[in-house]
Swiss-Prot record:
This is Small ribosomal subunit biogenesis GTPase RsgA. The keyword Hydrolase applies. GO terms for biological process: ribosomal small subunit biogenesis. Keywords: Cytoplasm, GTP-binding, Hydrolase, Metal-binding, Nucleotide-binding, Ribosome biogenesis, RNA-binding, rRNA-binding, Zinc. It comes from Mycoplasmopsis agalactiae (strain NCTC 10123 / CIP 59.7 / PG2). Binds 1 zinc ion per subunit. It holds the Pfam family RsgA_N. GTP binds at residues 108-111, 155-163. It comes from the Bacteria. Zn(2+) binds at residues 235, 240, 242, 250. Monomer. Associates with 30S ribosomal subunit, binds 16S rRNA.
Length: 281
């Protein structure tokens, strides 16, 4: 039988088959011996009431959260409470785009104000949606994004991910208030799982977090963003880090000077590069 892994709990995989029936099964030990770990989103073959016997080749996979075969990863970032942080957005995007997955930006709590970065990110080619929980109009606007797609939500704790999931699915996941002391919400989501939404769409909500190690090399980071990858082809050196190289040797620096790449994006990139250098020491 064939199916898709919808959730994992203590080594038991919840698989939805082609007839929309669910099966809770372990995986064959051979996967463990080969250091292959089944992930939420994997397409698999299994023997009914026995084991997962095969994992099909993945379109892509992501480390945090551990998921496979993803169409979009949606970065959920609040405009206020907590304040919008372009550095975190760019950090997530570097991580996402390096895995060849398309990032999308959801700006929540739009009723509290507008984000000055919306136009900036749209000019860079990203889809940006502003979401106000005062109205349900945004639900219609995002529906097409989910049609026949598997999308992941990721972002800081306290930015409204759980409220967003509740609105989309009609479920009632636990919502916890912002901690005024820490200025971030407490973690509410625990298990990575697929939830069916809209027209044959799939949503994977993930645990919120306030920090994320980038886990990229300097070379991977330098060509992580789609725009950097395209413009970086014209740098004089293939190993250009767009950092200390002369401006006439680095096409990324030239693009910043020409306002093709926003200054804030380049500044965030340099900050990320410093993080990578510190991690590698």
């Amino acid at each position: 039988m064939k199916g898709k892994i919808y959730s994992i709990n203590s080594g038991i995989y919840s698989i939805k088959d082609e007839n929309n029936n669910f099966h809770n099964l372990p995986a064959l030990g051979v996967f463990r011996h080969k250091n292959i770990v089944p992930l939420v989103g994997d397409y698999v073959e299994f023997e009914k009431e026995k084991y997962i016997t095969k994992i099909y080749e993945r379109q892509n996979e992501f480390i945090r959260p551990k998921v496979a075969n993803i169409d979009h990863i949606i970065i959920v970032m609040s405009i206020h409470e907590p304040e919008f942080q372009s550095f975190l957005v760019d950090k997530y995007m570097a991580f996402i785009e390096s895995a060849n997955i398309e990032p999308v930006l959801f700006n929540t709590k739009a009723d509290l104000g507008t984000s000055k970065y919306k136009n900036e990110y749209e000019s860079l080619g990203y889809k940006v949606y502003e979401i106000s929980y005062k109205t349900d109009e945004w639900v219609k606007n995002i529906a097409k994004l989910f049609t026949n797609k598997t999308n992941v939500l990721m972002g800081q704790s306290g930015v409204g991910k759980t409220t967003l999931v509740n609105k989309i699915t009609g479920s009632n996941f636990a919502v916890q208030a912002i901690s005024k002391f820490a200025n971030r919400g407490k973690h509410t989501t625990r298990i990575v799982q697929i939830v069916n939404v809209f027209d044959n769409g799939e949503l994977i909500d993930t645990p919120g977090f306030s920090s994320l190690d980038i886990n990229l090399t300097k070379q991977q980071l330098a060509y992580s963003y789609k725009q950097f990858k395209e413009l970086g082809k014209f740098c004089k050196f293939k190993t250009c880090f767009h950092q200390n190289e002369p401006e006439n040797f680095c096409n990324i620096k030239q693009a910043v000077k020409d306002n093709i790449i926003p200054q804030f994006r380049y500044n965030n990139y340099l900050k990320l590069l410093q993080e990578v250098e510190n991690e590698q020491k």
